[in-house]
């Protein structure tokens, strides 16, 4: 009985996500993603046009939303 209880406790600990980390898209060209650090709690996206021939899109993780950027706080929300 003790073995069964111990097994259940171990399985519960392994299955629980004890330190949730956010996952954000990190590339402007494709859907590459990365797991954020524990202190990074938002995904960001910023698009800007430095010249007439193209657009640059920045995506990634941040600890707070940079001014002027679009941010969200769920996995893969910054596409």
Swiss-Prot record:
Q: Where does this protein chiefly localize?
A: secreted
Sorted alphabetically, which keywords does the UniProt record give?
Disulfide bond, Neurotoxin, Postsynaptic neurotoxin, Secreted, Signal, Toxin
The UniProt record lists the keyword GTP-binding: no
What GO cellular component term, any one, is given? extracellular region
Q: Which residues form the signal peptide?
A: 1-21
Gene Ontology MF: a single term: toxin activity
Q: Which cysteines are joined by disulfide bonds?
A: 24-43, 36-61, 65-71, 72-77
| Subcellular location per the Swiss-Prot or TrEMBL entry | Secreted
Q: Which Pfam families match?
A: Toxin_cobra-type (PF21947)
Expression across tissues is: Expressed by the venom gland.
Q: What does this protein do?
A: Blocks both the muscle-twitch response to nerve stimulation and the response to exogenous acetylcholine.
Which protein family is it in? Belongs to the three-finger toxin family. Short-chain subfamily. Orphan group XVIII sub-subfamily.
Q: What is this protein called?
A: Neurotoxin 3FTx-LI
């Amino acid at each position: 009985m003790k073995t069964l209880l111990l097994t259940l406790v171990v399985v519960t600990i392994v299955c629980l996500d004890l330190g949730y980390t956010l996952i954000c898209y990190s590339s402007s060209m494709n859907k590459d993603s990365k797991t954020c650090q524990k202190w990074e709690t938002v995904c960001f996206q910023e698009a800007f046009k430095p010249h007439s021939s193209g657009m640059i899109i920045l995506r990634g993780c941040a600890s707070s939303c940079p001014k002027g950027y679009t941010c969200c706080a769920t996995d893969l929300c910054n596409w």
